[in-house]
Amino acid sequence: MYGILVLEDGTIIRGDGFGAETEVLGELVFNTSMTGYVEILTDPSYKGQIVTMTYPLEGNYGVEKEWFESDGIKAEGFVVKDMTGSKLDEFLKEYNIPGISGVDTRYITRKIRSKGVIRSLLKTSTNPITKDEETELIKKVVEYPDISEIDLVPEVSTKETVIYNAEDEKTRCVLIDCGVKQSIIDCLVERGCSVVKVPYNSKEEEIMSYNPDFVLVSNGPGDPENMAETVETVKNLIGTLPVTGICLGHQLITIALGGKTYKLKFGHRGGNQPVKDIDSGKVYITSQNHGFATDDKIVPEGSELMHMNLNDDTVEGIRKIESNDLKNTVWSVQYHPEAGPGPHDARFLFDEMVELGIKFKAEKAN
């Protein structure tokens, strides 16, 4: 099958198509992970994006449902240097997602690094793609909106409340689902924390009706500035009970506290991002997937930076300055402590979430 990748600057990249025979538009990004293509493709945070893998070989260890981070592929398309085996091809076909192989992913990555993320179109076809078609495809890319103009969270958030009960419940969390990864839920449940997953646009009254001991605002796709409704809910919850966040959730908490976010040139996507804990000086290697960040020049009043990225000095964690009152506790991280895929250096943060919930539960009982 023929494959073609068309960039907004008119660049045409031809290769071998695999997966579904179709055409998609999206923001072209790169991921530096050496493994974990199943987790990456099924991560809801990739909604609206075509993912390029910098590691050259993909598909060599198959596909298993136990690795899924959601109910299916959420990325729009997949770009690899070499694709091996039939499982990855079948996987993309099952979810009607196109892929392209046999292309210079190093060239694509360097282009994104230099120019920034790029609007693009990926087309696969059993018929050769002509020069006349190329002109039409370029026009489609140029007319495609920037990802900041697309409201992506409603496409990946749960439509109804889902409860995950821990066998020996120690505490309960309401998770505001902006496109949560399954491994985040798993990390909480296995620590004795029952999780009530609610839609992104749930109001504080509904959230509090589940009697949570803390709230976690999840990861997800797109620009946090588009999510005024969720920000308002988070703002109303702060001071009522402990509030934590991961990735997009971190950005929403930043805005709720009075801070600002901005779009990164090419984002952080991969399992090898070094993060420094400002208090302890410890460095963690973390898994990340985000294209927006907290503006360190506008730290919300009453808050402080908690973690920083050692590659580019961007903000990786923020917290409300500690109070003796647990209900005022607020902290969030930009990276993914659950990994999925990636290192487990920061999974202790789930222990801290659960411990926070247990303490607040006891405080409520007194």
Curated annotation (Swiss-Prot):
Q: Ranges for the Glutamine amidotransferase type-1 domain? A: 172-363
Active-site positions on this chain: 247, 336, 338
Write down the top EC class of this protein: ligase
Task: Give the enzyme's EC designation.
Answer: 6.3.5.5
> Quaternary form?
Composed of two chains; the small (or glutamine) chain promotes the hydrolysis of glutamine to ammonia, which is used by the large (or ammonia) chain to synthesize carbamoyl phosphate. Tetramer of heterodimers (alpha,beta)4.
Cross-referenced HAMAP family, in alphabetical order?
Answer: CPSase_S_chain
Protein name (database record): Carbamoyl phosphate synthase small chain
Q: What is the lineage of its organism?
A: Archaea, Methanobacteriati, Methanobacteriota, Methanomada group, Methanococci
